[in-house]
Amino acid sequence: MSNTLYNHCTKLFQSIQRSLDELERGVQDESNTISLAGIQGQISASFLSLSRSIDDYDSMVQRELVPAKKKKATIRIQEFRQKHVQLLEKFDELKAHVRDIAQAKNRKELLGRRGYVNSLDSPYGNSTTDAEIVEGPSDLSRQDGLLKEHDFLGRAESQVDEFLERGRMILGDLVEQGSVLKATKTKVLNAANTLGITRHTLSLINRRSKQDKIIFYCGAFLVFVLFYLIYRWLR
């Protein structure tokens, strides 16, 4: 089981690294901020799954009886946690760049639309009247309000995309954990037949397996309910 968790953590690290590289390329190319927000949501969900998997691996290593294996696994956990912190710092840096790109893009679009509207409203081109000078501060405050509103909507859209992607990743992680539990149960039952474990112990294992299934299906149901509520809210 410890090898399974180790391989799972390794795959998550590889997946996060690929996603961070993709996000970094998107930042350099100043790609669509919506697609970048989707990548951010995927990475956030992967970090949650990784942190939980490392904790599970650490908990299992503490119960290891062979000193050599326990020492080796403890070193692996330390390396995992250090790499986790490094990747998280890089992710925070890239998220800051994405926010800067989105704000600059929104500000540019609003200023462009504002200039276009002013050119249509003014029949005298670039000439400045006393009324326009008086109304200048009001126009600036209204423009600042539009910028703030646009930035808020952009952040809200990014958060919704991130939440949806996180829910999808959590659901996938639940499915994967269900498969791991099923495989573990099979191994335990085979070992029980070999070692002659009592029926009482087997019944406890079966009961725990049923509880895990209930938790899995309840979690999946809650995720689908959240998806439905978000869908209704977006409509």
Swiss-Prot record:
Q: Which residues lie on this side of the membrane: Vesicular?
A: 235
The cellular location(s) given in this protein's UniProt record come to: Golgi apparatus membrane; Endoplasmic reticulum membrane
Classify the source by domain of life: Eukaryota
Keyword tags = Endoplasmic reticulum, ER-Golgi transport, Golgi apparatus, Membrane, Protein transport, Transmembrane, Transmembrane helix, Transport
List the coiled-coil residues.
none
Q: Name one GO cellular component term.
A: Golgi membrane
Its predominant location is Golgi
Question: What spans does the record annotate as topological domain Cytoplasmic, numbered to this chain?
Answer: 1-213
Q: What does this protein do?
A: SNARE required for targeting and fusion of ER-derived transport vesicles with the Golgi complex.
Which family is annotated? Belongs to the BOS1 family.
PANTHER family, alphabetically? GOLGI SNAP RECEPTOR COMPLEX MEMBER 2 (PTHR21230:SF1), VESICLE TRANSPORT V-SNARE PROTEIN VTI1-RELATED (PTHR21230)
Provide the protein name: Protein transport protein bos1
Q: Which organism is it from?
A: Schizosaccharomyces pombe (strain 972 / ATCC 24843)
Q: What is the lineage of its organism?
A: Eukaryota, Fungi, Dikarya, Ascomycota, Taphrinomycotina
The encoding gene? bos1
